[in-house]
A protein has these predicted regions:
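Short, small/polar residue-rich loop motifs at catalytic or cofactor-binding pockets
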Residues: 224-228
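Short, electropositive alpha-helical surface patch
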Residues: 75-81, 120, 169-187
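Conserved alpha-helical substructure of the radical SAM core
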Residues: 1-115, 126, 130, 134, ...
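C-terminal accessory region of radical SAM enzymes
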Residues: 145, 149-158, 180-219, 243-295
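Conserved strand-turn element in the central/C-terminal portion of the radical SAM core barrel
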Residues: 89, 144-172
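Short, acidic, Ser/Thr-enriched surface-loop or helix-capping motifs
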Residues: 233-236
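Non-cysteine beta-strand/loop elements that form the S-adenosyl-L-methionine
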Residues: 111-123, 187-194
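Hydrophobic "anchor" residues
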Residues: 238-240
Length: 296
């Protein structure tokens, strides 16, 4: 596969567990309804080896709904990636979990360039609890101070924060942006929320802090560009064509235990799924209202 035909990164879901209950995320609705899983380490390695053979150089551990740092094997995975030919690693986390073993793995990154994105909202104790659904504001702020030391001492590790705006802000978001600057983190504001393909439409519209902040939907004219850019291998080894919002696996076209990702990426199933975007009747259900959709 030529480098121009490779996805921007291969996404790997190493766990399906999250430790926050964000009001703008679908995770709280499914928490407790499915068994907690962690990707088997041999499967994880085989997925990366296959991707490297294709010429792949970038991995993301951002799942659809979960937090990579809750994965009990995350430190081992970071060590493995750092020892592999993978050049770049990135993923998003709420950064509630920053256990000593994870901290050590961050400190020891010496080969792979690693950029962690931290997604959060509610920039004081009270608003954080209301919007992130857990009382972990102080813990996250302390974890960020620890991360700052690593970012400033290890040039392979960088961090950026996505600061999600909300109604009722009394200046705390700007103070958080200053905190980022002072601690060596990049940051940007996110003004809008999406509805998880319509699954969260009522929740977002009716939330006093988020209402009126829904991302615009684009008309479906061509295959979604995400199908070219963000393939996800789930904790069970399923190849899900979209990393973004496919909570229930409607866009799964195979499993890497049966067929390697390298074959599925150039196979007929992927092309057939993309073709479904040309007709409203065949458009996957989850894609019909998705605000993450961008035509390729």
């Amino acid at each position: 596969v030529s480098s121009s035909e490779l996805p921007g990164a291969l996404y790997i879901e190493t766990t399906n567990l999250c430790n926050a209950r964000c009001v703008f995320c679908y995770y709280p609705k499914v928490h407790g309804t499915m068994p907690v899983k962690y990707m088997n380490m041999d499967l994880f390695k085989s997925v990366i080896e296959d991707y490297v053979q294709m010429g792949g150089k970038e991995i993301s551990l951002t799942p659809t709904i979960a937090d990579p740092l809750v994965d009990k094997l995350i430190h081992e995975r970071l060590e493995y990636i750092d020892s592999s030919p993978i050049k770049k690693l990135r993923f998003y986390s709420n950064f509630i979990s920053f256990r000593p073993k994870i901290r050590e793995a961050f400190q020891n990154m010496s080969n792979t360039k690693f950029d962690i994105g931290i997604s959060m909202t509610g920039f004081n104790k009270e608003m954080y609890h209301k919007l992130m659904g857990v009382d972990q504001y102080d813990k996250v702020m302390n974890n960020l101070r620890e991360l700052s030391k690593i970012v400033q001492s290890n040039s392979n590790v960088s961090a950026h924060l996505v600061l999600r705006k909300y109604k009722g802000d009394e200046g705390e978001t700007d103070r958080m942006a200053k905190f980022c600057r002072d601690h060596g983190f990049k940051s940007h504001f996110e003004e809008v929320y999406d509805t998880w393909g319509g699954l969260m439409e009522e929740d977002i519209k009716n939330n006093e802090y988020l209402k009126g902040r829904i991302r615009k939907r684009l008309p479906r004219t061509k295959p979604c560009e995400v199908t070219y850019r963000k393939p996800l291998i789930t904790v069970d080894g399923d190849y899900k064509v979209c990393e973004c919002r496919d909570v229930f696996g409607e866009l799964i076209i195979g499993n890497v235990k049966d067929t390697p990702f390298s074959e599925m990426w150039v196979g007929p199933e992927l092309e057939a799924l993309r073709q479904r975007f040309y007709n409203e009747d065949t458009l996957p259900e989850i894609c019909k209202k998705c605000e993450m959709y961008v035509p390729k």
